[in-house]
């Protein structure tokens, strides 16, 4: 999945339209928007929370029939519900099952300390669904108008020891679920579901087995989630039909297992979420070994999560091959193996992004047992920065000031200085918006900082014009910029799994606190 010339041309077209018309913070994950620069481009990774795991098996119903502990989202879902002002988690637990798992619910006021409420679905437990599943995706669908379908559960259920199918359920509260409303054909295991608001489609990321590439992904989309599930079925060896398309496989330069370097990487899972102006993709890269070898060695398979981004929801830029959510090299750690992503990532908590993951302890007797839930944290927008050292540098972006574009904001960590100059379409500084006119950002670390000039507190006078924004940095990192309709700096972009103080509509707009929207 490298950037080929045709794809690059397509992305250039998309991004030119995007920067001109898109609302949302503009992230430096996207190099196609850069006209000129002499800055260094730096990829960043989250830091695991020191209090991990934030959730693990401590209830008898979280053990399977063999007594093995399970308490983590297998996709599952971790979301912030702005209406109820709490973090919500749907995770997989043993449930006394033999083949698969059941779905449990937990909640939190801060995203770090989780409680398992006693509910009435299976009295005396926090179990909310008893279908014996391989994996499950739970969506808190903030774009759904029907309140009875606000929560959606895509359950990959075991039919028997060898086959699985997907069922779709709805809920108004995330606790009490409907009977299945749609049923797929036979599938491979480890599928995932999500919503793409740019395409206005629900998406299934379907596992397939493709020759030399082995574990790979197929793509299925539909605006109706019931049709989506009903159309899903297993397809072999890089084949497609009218609705299902072959999507992608692992790259040769994806990370490999240090003890098994001869094993070619594979895609174990993939899911995605809208964040600001793009789709953020999570690629769980399998590095081996196979389950039989794991059993014989009493170890976990090595899965690590890498990230990518997309402007069209189908073609992915995966330039960074550094694990974003890695395993720990500590044999006894909660994430010693098999780290996988969770539906709802990222959540926006103040100046940070929260990423929840499932991780596995090395354990006996089963290679896939004993899993728990961890948290990793990253600066908001902090995937990639443009960095200047002691020598001043710049990055120049061509854009159009939108009709509602009143205020320019940046997300930057400035130990020295940052200034912005606005140039016309011919590359000449616009009077009143020169570097000298700019009010410097000095020795300040802000994820939302308004930029102004001595005679221009905003960019309202430039609305509708095509301009170049030249950011001058010295001893500074810039992570994002955006042009907001509001003096309070909301971007109009998508907010992932949500967060405290945000609008409950899934979009970064000013919140009417009386309505919790």
Task: Explain the meaning of each model-derived region.
Residues 21-268, 273-336, 350, 356-516:
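Beta-rich carbohydrate-recognition and catalytic domains
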Residues 4-15:
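Sec-dependent N-terminal signal peptides
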């Amino acid at each position: 999945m490298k950037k080929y010339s045709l794809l690059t041309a397509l992305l250039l077209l998309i991004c030119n339209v995007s920067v001109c018309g898109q609302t949302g913070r503009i992230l430096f994950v996207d190099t196609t928007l850069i006209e000129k620069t002499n800055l260094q481009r730096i990829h960043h990774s989250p830091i695991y929370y020191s209090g991990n795991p934030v959730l693990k098996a401590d209830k008898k119903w979280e053990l399977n029939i063999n007594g093995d502990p399970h308490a983590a989202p297998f996709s599952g879902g971790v979301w912030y519900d702005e209406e109820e002002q709490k973090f919500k988690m749907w995770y997989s637990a043993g449930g006394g099952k033999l083949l698969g798992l059941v779905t449990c619910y937990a909640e939190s006021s801060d995203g770090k300390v989780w409680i398992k409420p006693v509910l009435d679905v299976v009295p005396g437990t926090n179990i909310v669904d008893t279908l014996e599943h391989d994996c499950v995706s739970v969506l808190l669908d903030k774009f759904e108008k029907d309140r009875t379908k606000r929560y959606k559960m895509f359950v990959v259920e075991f039919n028997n020891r060898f086959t699985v199918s997907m069922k779709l359920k709805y809920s108004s509260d995330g606790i009490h679920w409907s009977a299945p409303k749609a049923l797929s054909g036979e599938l491979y295991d480890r599928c995932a579901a999500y919503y793409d608001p740019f395409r206005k489609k629900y998406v299934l990321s379907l596992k397939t087995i493709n020759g030399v590439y082995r574990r790979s992904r197929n793509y299925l989309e539909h605006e109706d989630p019931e049709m989506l599930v009903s159309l899903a079925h297993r397809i072999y060896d890089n084949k497609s039909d009218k609705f299902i398309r072959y999507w992608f496989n692992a790259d040769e330069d994806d990370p490999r297992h240090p003890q098994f370097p001869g094993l070619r990487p594979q895609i174990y899972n993939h899911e995605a979420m809208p964040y600001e102006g793009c789709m953020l993709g999570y690629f769980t890269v399998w590095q081996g070994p196979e389950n039989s070898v794991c059993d014989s060695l009493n170890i976990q398979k090595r899965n690590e999560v890498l990230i990518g981004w997309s402007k069209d929801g189908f073609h992915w830029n995966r330039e960074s091959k550094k694990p974003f959510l890695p395993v720990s090299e500590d044999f006894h750690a909660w994430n010693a193996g098999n780290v996988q992503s969770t539906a709802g990532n990222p959540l926006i908590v103040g100046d940070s992004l929260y990423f929840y993951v499932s991780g596995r302890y090395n354990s006996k007797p089963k290679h896939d047992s004993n899993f728990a839930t961890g948290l990793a944290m990253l600066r908001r927008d902090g995937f990639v920065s443009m960095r200047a050292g002691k020598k001043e540098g710049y990055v120049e972006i061509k854009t159009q000031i939108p009709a509602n574009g009143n205020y320019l904001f940046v997300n930057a960590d400035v130990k020295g200085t940052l200034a912005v100059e606005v140039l016309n379409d011919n590359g000449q500084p616009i009077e009143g918006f020169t570097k000298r006119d700019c009010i410097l950002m000095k020795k300040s670390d802000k994820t939302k900082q308004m930029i102004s000039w001595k005679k221009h507190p905003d960019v309202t006078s430039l609305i509708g014009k095509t301009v170049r924004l030249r950011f001058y940095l010295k001893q500074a990192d810039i992570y994002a910029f955006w042009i907001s309709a509001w003096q309070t700096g909301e971007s109009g972009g998508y907010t992932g799994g949500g967060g405290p103080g945000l609008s409950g509509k899934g979009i970064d707009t000013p919140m009417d606190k009386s309505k919790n929207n």
